[in-house]
Amino acid sequence: MSETIAALATAYGIGSVSIVRLSGKDALATSLKLLKLSNLEPRYAKLAKIYSIDDEILDEGIVIYFKAPASFTGEDIVEFQTHGGVMVSERILNELIRAGARLAMPGEFSKRAFLNGKMDLAKAEAMQGLITSKSEIAAKILTRQMQGDLSKFVGEIRGEVVKTLAFVETMIDYADDDLPANLLEQTKLMLLKNSEKLERIATLSEQRRGLIDGFKIAIVGKPNVGKSSILNSFLAYERAIVSDEAGTTRDRIEENFKIGSHLVRIIDTAGIRKDAGKIEQIGINYSISAINEADIILAVFDGSCPSDEQDKEIIRLISNSNKKAFFILNKSDLAFKFDIELDGAIKISAKNDSSVVLKELEGYLKTQDTDEIMLSSNRQILSCKEASEALKRAFLRLNEEELEIFAYELNSAIKALASITKPFERSEILDEMFSHFCLGK
């Protein structure tokens, strides 16, 4: 990290203000080459003219110097706050590179902040998630994680396991001594308690991942029951072609939109039927796949027709999926003939009004909100599961008083927990994670 890096910290394009950021041991010296100043006072905003290396004036703006270690990265940082637009910031960035800085890689500022102890990995992931969040509830969850709630949760469990490991390794050196009975029971309780905590947070985070990424909602049913009409009604524009001809939708259509404070991804699928042609059958296979990957299913039936084997097959597929499902009986403006009793079925006329379905969805999504700590990435979920399983294995080894293997399992749990906040094997994990961050962050 000896090089001084530079990047545009604001979005590329037209705007009122652009920020060009430098970080590194030579950030101040490099910046002063573009300023006719002898120094900059740390943490003071200085209005200054900004020049090229060839003394051509580039802009006039605010320059702020953050002296290490009191900065985002823990290194010296200088920020140029200039007039917005593409060319001004590009010219300043190019001159800083001419002056000795290097263009930063995506996420390199955040990576340096992590390596310098300014944030842990959980906070870094939450920060990136917050930047890309598209719903109010996601922003709330990620803000809480940025404040350190997850780091504290993991740290407390890790501390208890480390303390136990230190004691057990001492006991291994004195193998002739028996473990005190009261300590044995306390340790067993600690292992079970923390294993359950980790398993619970991993399960909750998997089940409610839609709070952060958006819930996937699949609209399924036979051809020509009104699935596309419902989609168009939700979006308030004609996204899908609506026709009386069966099989009009042959591929799945996906759109993002918000229901209340929640982001959802709605999937309109091809109608499920047994006598489909080859191309349509591919669409039907996508429909079945959509059921498997969806968080919520909207099963649409034609209320003006008696049920048939295809309706029963759709109900069977949904029942086997164990997913939250809403049963919708469409075409309520026509004589009702559907003869299968469906608990909580919603009767609508999609061509007139589908708002009752949106209200039901909004009500259900609110029940998924939680004040509990959540994991924001698959990596965190996997690490929690690994730590939980290691503690379970340690419990079994402790029962058999196999202290060496018990200590090994505790070490496995500690390593899994550390990977959430401060991984032992840093380089590969960090390179992969920070490469997805914004340039200049």
Curated annotation (Swiss-Prot):
<comment type="subunit">
    <text>Homodimer. Heterotetramer of two MnmE and two MnmG subunits.</text>
</comment>
<dbReference type="InterPro" id="IPR027368">
    <property type="entry name" value="MnmE_dom2"/>
</dbReference>
<feature type="binding site">
    <location>
        <position position="441"/>
    </location>
    <ligand>
        <name>(6S)-5-formyl-5,6,7,8-tetrahydrofolate</name>
    </ligand>
</feature>
<feature type="binding site">
    <location>
        <position position="21"/>
    </location>
    <ligand>
        <name>(6S)-5-formyl-5,6,7,8-tetrahydrofolate</name>
    </ligand>
</feature>
<keyword id="KW-0378">Hydrolase</keyword>
<dbReference type="GO" id="GO:0005829">
    <property type="term" value="C:cytosol"/>
</dbReference>
<dbReference type="InterPro" id="IPR031168">
    <property type="entry name" value="G_TrmE"/>
</dbReference>
<dbReference type="Pfam" id="PF12631">
    <property type="entry name" value="MnmE_helical"/>
</dbReference>
<feature type="binding site">
    <location>
        <begin position="224"/>
        <end position="229"/>
    </location>
    <ligand>
        <name>GTP</name>
    </ligand>
</feature>
<dbReference type="Pfam" id="PF01926">
    <property type="entry name" value="MMR_HSR1"/>
</dbReference>
<dbReference type="InterPro" id="IPR018948">
    <property type="entry name" value="GTP-bd_TrmE_N"/>
</dbReference>
<keyword id="KW-0963">Cytoplasm</keyword>
<dbReference type="InterPro" id="IPR027266">
    <property type="entry name" value="TrmE/GcvT_dom1"/>
</dbReference>
<keyword id="KW-0342">GTP-binding</keyword>
<dbReference type="GO" id="GO:0030488">
    <property type="term" value="P:tRNA methylation"/>
</dbReference>
<comment type="similarity">
    <text>Belongs to the TRAFAC class TrmE-Era-EngA-EngB-Septin-like GTPase superfamily. TrmE GTPase family.</text>
</comment>
<dbReference type="GO" id="GO:0002098">
    <property type="term" value="P:tRNA wobble uridine modification"/>
</dbReference>
<dbReference type="InterPro" id="IPR005225">
    <property type="entry name" value="Small_GTP-bd"/>
</dbReference>
<feature type="domain" description="TrmE-type G">
    <location>
        <begin position="214"/>
        <end position="370"/>
    </location>
</feature>
<feature type="binding site">
    <location>
        <begin position="268"/>
        <end position="271"/>
    </location>
    <ligand>
        <name>GTP</name>
    </ligand>
</feature>
<protein>
    <recommendedName>
        <fullName>tRNA modification GTPase MnmE</fullName>
        <ecNumber>3.6.-.-</ecNumber>
    </recommendedName>
</protein>
<dbReference type="InterPro" id="IPR027417">
    <property type="entry name" value="P-loop_NTPase"/>
</dbReference>
<feature type="binding site">
    <location>
        <position position="118"/>
    </location>
    <ligand>
        <name>(6S)-5-formyl-5,6,7,8-tetrahydrofolate</name>
    </ligand>
</feature>
<dbReference type="Pfam" id="PF10396">
    <property type="entry name" value="TrmE_N"/>
</dbReference>
<feature type="binding site">
    <location>
        <position position="228"/>
    </location>
    <ligand>
        <name>Mg(2+)</name>
    </ligand>
</feature>
<feature type="binding site">
    <location>
        <begin position="243"/>
        <end position="249"/>
    </location>
    <ligand>
        <name>GTP</name>
    </ligand>
</feature>
<dbReference type="InterPro" id="IPR004520">
    <property type="entry name" value="GTPase_MnmE"/>
</dbReference>
<dbReference type="InterPro" id="IPR025867">
    <property type="entry name" value="MnmE_helical"/>
</dbReference>
<keyword id="KW-0547">Nucleotide-binding</keyword>
<keyword id="KW-0460">Magnesium</keyword>
<dbReference type="InterPro" id="IPR006073">
    <property type="entry name" value="GTP-bd"/>
</dbReference>
<feature type="binding site">
    <location>
        <position position="249"/>
    </location>
    <ligand>
        <name>Mg(2+)</name>
    </ligand>
</feature>
<dbReference type="GO" id="GO:0005525">
    <property type="term" value="F:GTP binding"/>
</dbReference>
<dbReference type="GO" id="GO:0046872">
    <property type="term" value="F:metal ion binding"/>
</dbReference>
<keyword id="KW-0479">Metal-binding</keyword>
<feature type="binding site">
    <location>
        <position position="79"/>
    </location>
    <ligand>
        <name>(6S)-5-formyl-5,6,7,8-tetrahydrofolate</name>
    </ligand>
</feature>
<keyword id="KW-0630">Potassium</keyword>
<dbReference type="GO" id="GO:0003924">
    <property type="term" value="F:GTPase activity"/>
</dbReference>
<comment type="function">
    <text>Exhibits a very high intrinsic GTPase hydrolysis rate. Involved in the addition of a carboxymethylaminomethyl (cmnm) group at the wobble position (U34) of certain tRNAs, forming tRNA-cmnm(5)s(2)U34.</text>
</comment>
<keyword id="KW-0819">tRNA processing</keyword>
